């Protein structure tokens, strides 16, 4: 993609709802977990393509707070896949200069997964080529709820005066306090809904809902979506002169 250093139209922060693994597997006559494994492979390709495409921040929706409602077999399989992915990708992520951080409520996750998450955050903290954020056991409403509880506790403890609370206060308590707001949110699989993903942060994001199932979402398709984004005019609530 062409780049004008003084006026780069490309999205700095892209967030992706990776949907369609199960339907992709069903179309192949395979179990749902097979689709999740193929989806994990696709993550690597998209991560590797980001620096060349000018994406500085990539946030991916890996597991929502509602996904616990799936069958125990699928949930257990997904947890095993997360552990395998975190273990096998550590070296490649480091070699490619990727900094990894996680958002979501860690309390319900297995200690082994939490340990790997913590390790990956520490090992990659000095990397700067790409900032990869993985939303794991994440829900937008849950995030705001947890943030509000922490804010209320600070008020109760006398650390924060109610009169000092404004629109800029809550983001400091969100999981994403270290991230800029997303410029573009992509959802694969043809579903046109946000599923609680980055509800507060995406107020002025552009959305792209595409029919492609996640395991079929190639870097070429990713680049095409980014090119479409570059043609849009973001007004942030203002009127075009």
Which role fits each region the language model picked out?
Residues 1-241:
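Flexible, compositionally biased loop and terminal segments
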């Amino acid at each position: 993609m062409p780049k004008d250093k003084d006026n780069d139209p490309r999205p700095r922060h892209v967030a992706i709802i990776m949907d369609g693994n199960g339907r992709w597997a069903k179309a192949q006559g395979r179990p749902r977990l097979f689709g999740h494994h193929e989806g994990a492979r696709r993550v690597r390709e998209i991560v590797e393509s980001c620096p060349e495409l000018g994406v500085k921040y990539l946030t991916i929706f890996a597991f929502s707070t509602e996904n616990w409602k799936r069958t125990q077999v699928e949930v257990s399989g997904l947890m095993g896949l997360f552990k395998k992915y975190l273990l096998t990708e550590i070296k490649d992520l480091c070699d490619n200069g990727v900094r990894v951080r996680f958002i979501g409520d860690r309390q319900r996750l297995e200690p082994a997964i939490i340990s790997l998450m913590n390790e990956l955050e520490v090992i990659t903290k000095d990397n700067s080529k790409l900032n990869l954020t993985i939303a794991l056991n994440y829900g937008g409403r849950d995030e705001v709820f947890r943030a509000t509880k922490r804010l209320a506790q600070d008020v109760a403890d006398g650390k924060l005066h109610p009169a000092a609370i404004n629109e800029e206060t809550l983001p400091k308590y969100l999981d994403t306090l270290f991230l800029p707001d997303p410029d573009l949110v992509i959802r694969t699989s043809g579903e046109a809904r946000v599923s609680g993903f980055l509800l507060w942060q995406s107020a002025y994001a552009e959305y792209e809902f595409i029919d492609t199932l996640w395991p079929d979402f190639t870097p070429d398709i990713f680049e095409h979506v980014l090119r479409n984004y570059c043609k849009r005019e973001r007004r942030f609530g203002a009127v075009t002169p």
